[in-house]
From Swiss-Prot:
Belongs to the radical SAM superfamily. Biotin synthase family. Catalyzes the conversion of dethiobiotin (DTB) to biotin by the insertion of a sulfur atom into dethiobiotin via a radical-based mechanism. Binds 1 [4Fe-4S] cluster. The cluster is coordinated with 3 cysteines and an exchangeable S-adenosyl-L-methionine. HAMAP family: BioB. The lineage of its organism: Bacteria, Pseudomonadati, Pseudomonadota, Alphaproteobacteria, Rhodobacterales. The keyword Translocase does not apply. Homodimer. This is Biotin synthase. One of its GO terms (biological process) is biotin biosynthetic process. Its EC number is 2.8.1.6.
């Protein structure tokens, strides 16, 4: 089923998709997926925290925020570029095609640390891997420098809908996020941009977040769908975990409205069984974060994933 590529979705349209009977929704999404992607092609991306903790932002879900003093987390300074590249090489040997590097910063500052990040990007690209970073807010000249270093994609999530956003984050505006994404796109960097479900948002909030993403022109190269991992010491520590059908609905709807985008299963994936994850792939997911740790949270291990992909007959992306 070849869906037209659109960037004019309304929130009502997206919400109507989210509310479809589940099997109808998954069936439609699978048709769209097969029209644009090989169904057994699942990209593996590895994610490393290159600077951990002490972030001045107040994101309610994040254990790396300096505002959440009860979280048990060891702060770590920015890693050495050579060490990061060696870890990228190890991830590549384990099957990862993309290496993503995250620094717990509010925004990038020019200087030695940014120069080191640029060296990391160049080193990862020299391995033949795709390189992605998430560093907080950028200015236009910094996006240009990242592009010149060979950066494949910049991750900067919207997190949730514009309407619900203020209940989760108070130190950075929604427009700040959109501005950084625009600077990256202007520099020729692909966008990796998604959000989180399970923070107390409504179904309409989920639809509104997807609508913002689907109305980018062109659509983001990849859209990570995260299920909240409640972390003790954060304001969302006692939120109920997301059920699999909520995640499947998000994946399927993202696939229908963004046919060419890689839809990535991200945080919270390890909560779900192999059969539940397979349902997400049937609904259109075609990328995962691969490895034992996802920044500071546990992730499905490479051994379990190898068994899963073997059972699915999934191919490695070239």
């Amino acid at each position: 089923m070849a869906e037209a590529i659109r960037s004019d979705w309304s929130v009502d349209e997206v919400e109507a998709l989210l509310r479809l009977p589940l099997l109808d929704l998954v069936g439609r999404a699978n048709g769209v997926h097969r029209a644009h992607h090989a169904p057994d092609d699942i990209q593996k991306a590895s994610l490393l925290s290159i600077k951990t903790g002490g972030c001045p932002e107040d994101c309610a879900y994040c254990p790396q925020s300096a505002h959440h003093r009860e979280v048990e987390l060891t702060r770590e300074k920015l890693m050495n570029p050579d060490h990061v590249v060696s870890l990228a090489r190890r991830a590549q040997r384990a099957g990862a095609e993309r290496f993503c590097m995250g620094a717990a910063w509010r925004q990038v500052r020019d200087g030695a640390e940014f120069d080191n990040v640029l060296a990391m990007v160049r080193g990862v690209r020299a391995l033949g891997m795709e390189a992605c970073v998430t560093l907080g807010m950028l200015r236009p000249h910094q996006a240009q420098r990242l592009a010149e270093a060979g950066l494949t994609a910049y991750n900067h999530n919207l997190d949730t809908s514009p309407e619900f956003y203020g209940q989760i984050i108070g130190t950075r505006t929604y427009q700040d996020r959109l501005d950084t994404l625009a600077y990256c796109r202007d520099a020729g960097i692909e966008l990796c941009c998604g959000g989180i479900i399970g923070m107390g948002e409504s179904l309409r909030d989920r639809a509104a977040m997807l609508q913002v993403l689907a109305n980018f022109a062109p659509h983001p190269e990849s859209v990570p769908i995260n299920a909240l991992i409640p972390i003790e010491g954060t304001p969302l520590a006692h939120r109920e975990r997301v059920g699999i059908f909520d995640l499947v609905r998000m994946v399927a709807t993202a696939r229908i409205i963004m046919p060419l985008t890689r839809v990535r299963l991200s945080a919270g994936r390890s909560d779900f069984s192999a059969a539940e994850q397979a349902l997400c792939f049937l609904a259109g997911a075609n990328s995962v974060f691969y490895g034992d740790v996802l920044l500071t949270a546990p992730n499905a291990g490479t051994g379990a994933d190898a068994e899963l992909f073997a059972a699915l007959g999934a191919l490695e992306t070239a």
